[in-house]
Amino acid sequence: MLLGLVGSEMCIRDSNRHLYLRTGRMTTMLKIRSSVFGAIHSFFRDRDFIEYQAPNFVAGAVEGGSTLFEVPYFGRKAYLTQSWQLYAEAAMPALERLYTIAPSFRAEKSRTRRHLTEFWHAEMEIAWADNNDVMDYGEALVRHIARTLLNERPAELESLGRDLEVIRRFADSDYPRIRYDEAVERLKSKGVEIEWGQDLDYSKE
């Protein structure tokens, strides 16, 4: 394992990717990532979910077409996927409880952690569920991932400067819930301009 590389500029790292992967920091992050993925799989499988994959080449957008990656496809247009949602909704009547861990591609500049050209994410679909059921699953998944990391990767987390007490709070705390109406009223009380029915973007969250 390499402890470091001379120069950390992006171009140097990209030109020496095979060496960068051997650095202590990168190796640590890959181990943590592996534990996160394993926790997601175990969470859903323990609850009788079926893992379901969808194509990465799709015919259209799911969440808006402004950031789609267009790909030439044998004389036709195709796009890199942003979500497995449409395929999952088609399969849900047959499988009822399904999930995936998959890549998502967006043709946008990677300016912040919220703007990534490619990222991996987990999605789930479940039949015969309401909003509270979905939130229950989401909260339980976060707790399960946090507990898994505390059990499997405490040293790695600390080596990256992560506070284990913060992660313990994610593992053990209750998550407050508020209705959309209340969220709008709270924002208005703080002087935020918002009308009922508008989405809550990152700044409002």
Residue ranges and their predicted role:
Residues M1-G7, C11-I12:
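Single conserved hydrophobic/aromatic residue that forms the stacking wall/gate
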